[in-house]
Amino acid sequence: MTGLRIILVSPLADGWAVICAGLEPLVFRSGARAEAQAKRLAACLAKLGRAVQVRIHDRARNLVGTQLYPAV
């Protein structure tokens, strides 16, 4: 998949980060809120013609979920 943009939801010492190349990291206290924001961001980018994959990591930094948002 050429041009696939990756959005990571990753743990921090005191919260969760949403990380996407070209954007400032977003920080949340709740993992659920970080995941929800990552999915909203992915949906917006997909509507703008960019394929996006959201990757969710747990506190141990294991990959626990992915979701693909194809370009619209």
Q: Where are each of the predicted segments found?
A:
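Short aromatic-glycine-(Arg/Gly/Cys) micro-motifs in beta-strand/loop hairpins
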Residues: 1-24
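Surface loops and adjacent helix of pleckstrin homology
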Residues: 21, 30-31, 68
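Short, solvent-exposed loop/turn motifs
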Residues: 24-25, 63
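Intrinsically disordered, low-complexity proline/glycine-rich segments
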Residues: 26-29, 57
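A short, charged, amphipathic alpha-helix used as a generic interaction element across diverse proteins
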Residues: 29-47
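Short, mixed-charge low-complexity intrinsically disordered segments
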Residues: 47-72
